[in-house]
Amino acid sequence: DTMGGGMYGSDRDGVRAAFADGAVSFWEALDALVGGAEIVVDRPRGSHHPDFPEFVYELDYGYLKGTTSADSEGIDVWIGSDPRRQVTGALCTVDLVKHDAELKILVGCTAGDCAVIRRFYRTPLSAVRILRRKKP
């Protein structure tokens, strides 16, 4: 499943032009990444993790097509229940088994959705920190 068009269309030249005059904030940069890429949902709500079937995705999970994360795959995205589909936060995971850390973007995630995501990462050898975007 993909979310394209409008805010989530693929407009990298538009993103470059919008920020050509100077530095951007963390949140503006995330808005630009999400706005300039298509969200591909490859693990829909209710699906099981491919390597750990005991883990069930209670929210849609996917990636930004055409982007690259630390694991050389697309930047991961959690899609929450807020229909406005705006960047609402970011999280960092630390996995001591894989010896890695990753950034994931939260789109449309409410406080309740963030609690669900925290539970998903609650394992003995991993840690998660969620940074919620303050409302203007």
Which residues fall in each region the model found?
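Hydrophobic N-terminal alpha-helices or hydrophobic patches in metabolic proteins across all domains
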Residues: G4-P136
